Every structure is written in C-alpha cells, then in structure tokens.
Amino acid sequence: MILHRGARPLEHFDPDLVDLPVKRTREVGIRVEVDTEVRGIEALGAELLVHAAQRGQDRRFEADAAVHSAGRVPEIDDLDLEAAGVERETRGVIVNEFLQSVSNPNVYAGGDAAASGPPLTPKGDHDVAVLVTNLLEGNHRTPNYDGIASAVFSVPPLASAGLTETAARAAGLRFHTNWRDTSAWFNTRRVGETTSGFKVLIDEQTDRIIGAHLLGPHADEMINVFAVAIRLGIPARDLKETLFAYPTHGSDIRFML
C-alpha cells in the first residue's frame, strides 16, 4: 500500500507517464491512496495501525511495516543563521544568481542548503564549483541546470530532463510533443517488462529538444543522452540520424523523435 499526501504521485514528472506505472501498480494488487496525510503510527502487537486524514475524513490502515519516504530537508537548523543575518526559507538559504546570500554577502550556499534550483544530488557538485569560484575570484559565475536529468529508480525506472509540457507552455514556447505508450515495443517485451512509454518535446522553430520524459527499462541511463542533447542544443533531426548499437534500448531513441 502506498499513502501519498498529494493529489497524484511524482508531481514533478510527466503525468501521462506517471499514470502508466500507477495503473500497473494497482493492477498487481498494490493500493495507491492519494490525498492522504499520515498523522501517526500506532503499534498494535506485531502490527501497525497508520492514522491518516484523507479528503477531510479520518482513515486507518493496518500494516506489518511502515516505510517513510517523504524526502529530505537541509541540515541547517543548528547553524543559527539568524544571528548572522542570513535569510532562509524552508528549502534553504535564499541566494542570488551567484549562490551568495541575499542578506549577508559573506555567506554562500549551494546544493541542498540553497533554496533555489532542483533538489538533486548532481546539483550539489555543480554548485560547489560555482560558489568556490565566486568566493576566490569574485562573483562572475552562475549555475547552469539546463538539461539536468533526474530519475525514479522504480521498476521500471522513470526519468526526466528539461521542461515538462506545463513549463514549456508557461514559458511561451511553441513546440510539438511526441508521446507514446511503448509497452508493446520489442525492447520492452524482450526483457519481460510490461510498462513503458516516452514523451519528447521539440521546439518548432529551432528543432531543439526542450524536454524528454522516459519510462521503461534503462530509462535512467537513456535520459542522459537527452540531457546532453538539451544542454548542448543538438537538433532533434541530428539525434534521430545517430545510429546506436542494436538491440540496446538506446537504439529506440530515433523512433522517439
């Protein structure tokens, strides 16, 4: 059983692709309860009773074990930032484009400790290089998260790079979307998987890929190809003409463009 606080799981990923594994999860007998906020867990002998609120109603769920997977918060509460005049939000220190505190110019923050940018592990490595450069040489370098890839290591994996359709529309971009359920494709069936799909967003004016969203075997590796294409501005037509080793899952990329 999965108890999820939001209206749908994995809110930051493409909803059409998220719907596929959620549907499959329910088909194999796993309950997915959304809009459900856990209020407490009570031990009843060898079992657990989970108390929750769902759409204004009190709910109780019996379980043998409970796993907390709500993510992480920055470990900065003990730094006494207020004493140093460092403004912060729930997500972390409020910084400018140079990762410098907006309220104390002697303080820099990056990775999980900064309130801006994607909450992903590679961001930390990237931010360190940026803020150290600015500390030593003066503010002139800014972080660039274009095309940064993220993945959910589920079975099968779900991965994303670039913009979602919602973000692309909000940015006023003109683009077309290639979207398909590929559960019947050879590379999905040959490894015994039942669920896969993709959605790729391509700018109508430049032919550049602005977003890629993958679900299926090795999606967590394939997304890195799209991350490179997005960051370097490789046209979709050029990537489509690239011949990948067959029958790797990467050989399906040209059919997504």
List where the protein language model places each region:
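Rossmann-like dinucleotide-binding cores of NAD(P)H-dependent redox enzymes
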Residues: 1-45, 51-57, 117-125, 132-133, ...
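Glycine/Thr-rich phosphate-binding loops of Rossmann-like dinucleotide-binding domains
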Residues: 10, 75-78, 90, 117, ...
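General small-molecule cofactor/ligand-binding pocket signal
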Residues: 31-33, 61, 108, 176-178
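Short acidic-glycine loop/turn motifs at beta-strand connectors
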Residues: 45, 89, 204-206
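Short, acidic, Ser/Thr-enriched surface-loop or helix-capping motifs
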Residues: 55, 96-97, 203-204
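FAD-site-proximal beta/loop scaffold in flavoenzymes
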Residues: 60-137
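A short alpha-helix-loop-beta-strand transition element characteristic
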Residues: 87-89, 138-147, 173-178
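Flexible, glycine-rich terminal cap/loop adjacent to redox cofactors
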Residues: 136, 153-257
